[in-house]
UniProtKB/Swiss-Prot annotation:
This is Hemoglobin subunit alpha. GO terms for molecular function: haptoglobin binding; heme binding; iron ion binding; organic acid binding; oxygen binding; oxygen carrier activity; peroxidase activity. Signal peptide: none annotated. Heme b binds at residue 87. CDD domains: Hb-alpha-like (cd08927). Residues 1-141 form the Globin domain. Belongs to the globin family. The modification Phosphoserine is found at residues 3, 49, 102, 124, 138. GO terms for biological process: hydrogen peroxide catabolic process. It comes from Camelus dromedarius (Dromedary). The keyword Protease does not apply. The modification Phosphothreonine is found at residues 8, 108, 134, 137.
Amino acid sequence: VLSSKDKTNVKTAFGKIGGHAAEYGAEALERMFLGFPTTKTYFPHFDLSHGSAQVKAHGKKVGDALTKAADHLDDLPSALSALSDLHAHKLRVDPVNFKLLSHCLLVTVAAHHPGDFTPSVHASLDKFLANVSTVLTSKYR
């Protein structure tokens, strides 16, 4: 459960991420593919090279979904319901991959906003991403 301080930290962080969400999403995906090569198996039809249009497009989807989640912190299940269905029933993504992408997202945000990435913000974003991951895997049962 996100505390009021966590919610403030997440909203503040996403205020700074703002127009860069698609860029950061793509960068986090690239980090994930490089650091955890087994994650590439879910994207056999993608050009996974640096800067590819497909990775950028998927990064935009990731960024948009996280921005939507940050805008609906008090009702993540409703905000992410369609995405949860997609990942559970059609894509069947192994839940561990959400943790890997979350880690890469944190690294990306820290790299772009080192002065703002305090331990408190780090903890809040980590909780937020864990909550998003929980919602996305909630329909796997």
